[in-house]
Amino acid sequence: SGTKQWTQLLGTTSNDFAYGVTVDNSNNIYLTGYTTSVFENTTGIGGRDTFLVKYDSSGSQQWIQQFGSTLNDYGRGVTADSSDNIYVTGYTTGAIDSNTNSGSDDIFIAKFNSSGTKQWTQQIGTSALDYGRGVSVDSSDNIFVIGRTDGGLDGNSNAGGADLKSDIFLIKYNTSGTKQWTSQMGSSSYDSTWGIAVDNSSNIYVTGYTAGVLDWNSTFGNLDIFLVKYNTSGTKQWSRTMGTSSNDLSYAVTVDSANN
């Protein structure tokens, strides 16, 4: 009926930003973003830190974790798998845990169990700017991470050529954090992605916006919306663009039980 059930406020004495939210199979709620300070009962790592907070369905906070490198870290997307493990993606200017920074802003993906204990962290990047933006899982608990890169990830070529314009990427990990493959695509101009969804057949759908021409699609204006479908092996199935003569931006996508 649309009646508000509860509202919770979370913060520090400084600036705090939330970007991603998800629920698990028990209807617990998980929120991620970043803080410029230190949350109560946590420890600051350095600079801006990513946070992950868990609430139960009544809105009672269960725990909060603050993590990152000694530099700046930004949480952007969060999802839960069938065992209520939680995955957070974003980007870092440093090196998280035992990982190595590739030269600039790197993508990270971190796994937590339902009690808030971190299981592993993976970091990937180029010498250019790389941003993790969204994360989702399939029915086998494989993890898919999307975002944008100004370089060429894992041997992929940047579609912008020598100009190194931003491309979109899709990376698959298994539940142990082992990378399975990396796919990268883009136009000769700027491309950025924000939304991801996985259907019942483990096909992946990615949305965002482009300033160029993706594949054989038409361009409509300055910035156009795109939707791309990949299969579970990382092979692109199709791409579509739409837009007006002005700027059009897409930030989220979902699928229903019939895979629409």
Residue ranges and their predicted role:
Residues 1-260:
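A sequence-level/structural motif corresponding to short, flexible coil/turn segments enriched
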